[in-house]
């Protein structure tokens, strides 16, 4: 679950205040104009920014002041942040062990994660040999390896064409079902999510102004 109670961020250009209640396992889309506060909302939940006041509860624990690594959250950005000199396997390994010195069990987990996103045969490839959609699949698999119950997506597929976006969104829905993930997804294409989202939040001027159920 995700619960934000009067979470205030004193941004110089746009003061923000968020109240939010998302049940465990729900899938939520976040829409709004550029600069409205969508990414800031995710950053507050992930721990990349800290509020001036208010509380952030994640899975029944107060994480208002927790460091990002202490939170039950993984976050995927538009930039896939893959290291070009490392193979797919090594990039995935960074999700669980930065030293890249893996046990047999950890290696098996990496192979399973790669297979879950359709890249089981790409482990020895370098990122520059992958398509944009394949790179995002690697980044998604790395998030899943962290084994966190809350997944935050900040427009990760906006640079892809519509066909690839639809494929990636279908993959996300499948993985959420399999792993019982709670999902928050910032998007500019809410129509592509019809049938796979529990609610849509509209962020305007640093606040959640609307909530639509059952999209």
Swiss-Prot record:
The keyword Nucleotide-binding applies. GO terms for cellular component: plasma membrane. InterPro entries: AAA+_ATPase, ABC_SmlMolc_Importer, ABC_transporter-like_ATP-bd, ABC_transporter-like_CS, P-loop_NTPase, Thiamine_ABC_ThiQ. It catalyses: thiamine(out) + ATP + H2O = thiamine(in) + ADP + phosphate + H(+). It comes from the Bacteria. Residues 2-215 form the ABC transporter domain. It is an enzyme of class 7 (translocase). The keyword Transport applies. GO terms for molecular function: ABC-type thiamine transporter activity; ATP binding; ATP hydrolysis activity. ATP binds at residues 32-39. Pfam families: ABC_tran (PF00005). It is found in: Cell inner membrane. Its EC number is 7.6.2.15. It is a peripheral membrane protein. The complex is composed of two ATP-binding proteins (ThiQ), two transmembrane proteins (ThiP) and a solute-binding protein (ThiB). Part of the ABC transporter complex ThiBPQ involved in thiamine import. Responsible for energy coupling to the transport system. Belongs to the ABC transporter superfamily. Thiamine importer (TC 3.A.1.19.1) family. This is Thiamine import ATP-binding protein ThiQ.
């Amino acid at each position: 679950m995700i619960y934000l109670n009067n979470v205030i961020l004193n941004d110089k250009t746009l003061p923000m205040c968020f109240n939010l209640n998302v049940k465990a396992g729900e899938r939520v889309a976040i829409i709004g104009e550029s600069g409205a506060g969508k990414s800031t909302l995710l950053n507050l939940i992930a721990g990349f920014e800290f509020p001036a006041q208010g509380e952030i509860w994640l899975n029944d624990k107060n994480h208002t002041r927790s460091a990002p690594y202490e939170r039950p959250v993984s976050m995927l950005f538009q930039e896939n942040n893959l290291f070009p000199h490392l193979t797919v396997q090594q990039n995935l390994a960074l999700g669980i062990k930065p030293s890249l010195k893996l046990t047999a069990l950890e290696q098996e987990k990496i192979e399973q994660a790669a297979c879950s996103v359709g890249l089981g045969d790409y482990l020895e490839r370098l990122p520059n040999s992958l398509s944009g959609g394949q790179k995002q699949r690697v980044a998604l698999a790395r998030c899943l390896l962290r084994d966190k119950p809350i997944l935050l997506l900040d427009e990760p597929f906006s640079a892809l064409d519509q066909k690839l976006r639809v494929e990636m969104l279908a993959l996300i829905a499948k993985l959420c079902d399999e792993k019982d993930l709670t999902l928050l997804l910032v998007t500019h294409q809410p129509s592509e999510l019809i049938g796979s989202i529990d609610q849509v939040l509209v962020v305007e001027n640093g606040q959640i102004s609307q909530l639509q159920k059952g999209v």
